[in-house]
Amino acid sequence: MQLNEAVSKRLTELLDERNMTQYQLYMKSGVPKSTIGNLVNCTYDSMKLRVLHELCQGLEISLPEFFASPLFEEENLEP
């Protein structure tokens, strides 16, 4: 899978685990709703690390916790 697909799946997992909507994440993180929607729907080419950091703050996790998923293991990602 491509990296943007892994980010989308992980973000969706974390939202589901917390019973949190994209709107609630927007309210907690300050990341625009459209950006969150683009990430969830894989309709972006790149993202800034700052955005991911803000999302993690809204989810109350660290960046390492975000990436602590089999989704990001080398064998699961396309080069």
Label every PLM stretch briefly.
Residues 1-21:
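A short, Lys/Arg-rich alpha-helix, primarily the initiator
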Residues 43-54:
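Short, basic-rich loop-to-helix N-cap that marks the start of a DNA-contacting helix
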Residues 15, 26, 56:
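The alpha-helix within a helix-turn-helix
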